[in-house]
Design a protein with these regions (language model features):
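Replace the tail clause
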Residues: 1-254, 258, 262-265, 297
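Long, K/E/R/D-enriched contiguous segments that form extended
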Residues: 247-319
Length: 319
């Protein structure tokens, strides 16, 4: 039958029934970000003014951003969480997750005007521009979960590492804010014993930390970001997870859309330039003379006939 309001209501009620009010997200572990559900709920809120829909989105976006599923040092979102609290992720990073999570945060910012969500957008687009963009302008597909044969090794930290890099005072601040434990909070996959390493994560926002200490939030965030920069510079020296450097037409369309929408909503010319360069790349390297698209490109070679999702998502990006 035809799609009508009752179908939208049914979808909303199903999501609300499955919502985790304590940790955000839907259902039990493993938990995926499912940003498309959040975008639906934002549209449902705009249509119905049902504040429950908006609160579900805000809670979920904040809890994900504060969790270990989010790369607190280098930004970007990992693929999913193996627990209910978003603490321990499967450390792989997928391009489409970045695009969809940007879209959900951007739309939430447009509804709420809360800069918390626009800052998340800026962080993820910074990550994609820095680590997931080819010199030609296309976006790479993914980064692996493991390096040196260990999942997450690139992303986890020992407490003494933080102390050596940041010094005693700054280390105390970082370890407290990001919930480090002396024995570690990252468990060995088979034995479930503590490994001595930590996944940085938050239990409350950086602004809430500042308020609790009677500090000005903007200055507090600036201080924390300076610590991130030191740790990021140190982390760059580690053996990096392997990058899947294929450029896929459909995922690039999603990312072009995320950059271009963010450019308009946040008035950021640099995001528009990134989107334009990626779009030009796709139309130059992934479009045949007869106008038909190809699905993938890697190291100068494009191939495979495109599918419907390639046309749909690249069209979305170009629009």
């Amino acid at each position: 039958g035809d799609l009508n309001a009752s179908h939208l209501d049914a979808c909303f009620h199903a999501l609300r029934e499955n919502f985790d009010p304590e940790h955000g997200g839907f259902g039990n572990r493993p938990k995926f970000p499912t940003a498309h559900n959040l975008s639906f709920l934002l549209r449902y809120y705009k249509r119905t003014e049902n504040t429950d829909a908006l609160e579900i989105v805000k809670t979920t976006l904040q809890k994900i951003h504060q969790g270990g599923i989010y790369d607190q040092v280098g930004f970007g979102i990992h693929r999913y969480s193996v627990d209910n609290e978003w603490l321990v992720p499967h450390f792989e990073k997928m391009l489409y997750d970045q695009a969809l999570f940007v879209q959900a945060n951007l739309e939430c910012f447009q509804v709420t005007k809360d800069p918390y969500f626009s800052r998340t957008v800026d962080e993820i687009l910074t990550y994609v521009s820095r680590d997931m963009t080819s010199p030609e302008g296309g976006f790479y597909s993914a980064e692996d979960a493991d390096s040196e044969g260990e999942e997450g090794k690139f992303y986890v930290w020992k407490q003494e590492e933080i102390e050596n890099i940041l010094g005693p005072n700054d280390a105390t601040l970082f370890l407290q804010v990001y919930r480090f434990e002396k024995d570690g909070n990252f468990l060995e996959e088979v034995t479930h014993e503590k490994t001595g390493t930590n996944i940085p994560h938050l239990r409350k926002s950086l602004d809430q930390h500042a308020h609790d200490k009677n500090q000005e939030p903007k200055e507090s965030r600036k201080k924390i970001r300076s610590l991130h920069a030191k740790l990021f510079a140190h982390r760059k020296k580690r053996i990096h997870p392997q990058k899947d450097d294929k450029v896929l037409t459909d995922w690039n369309g999603l990312m072009i859309s995320a950059f271009s929408q963010s450019a308009k909503a946040l008035n950021q010319e640099k995001y528009l330039k990134t989107a334009q360069k990626a779009a030009d790349f796709c139309l130059s390297e992934l479009r045949q003379k007869n106008g038909r698209l190809l699905k993938r490109w890697r190291k100068g070679k494009a191939g495979l006939p495109a599918h419907l999702e390639d046309y749909a998502f690249l069209s979305q990006g170009l629009l």
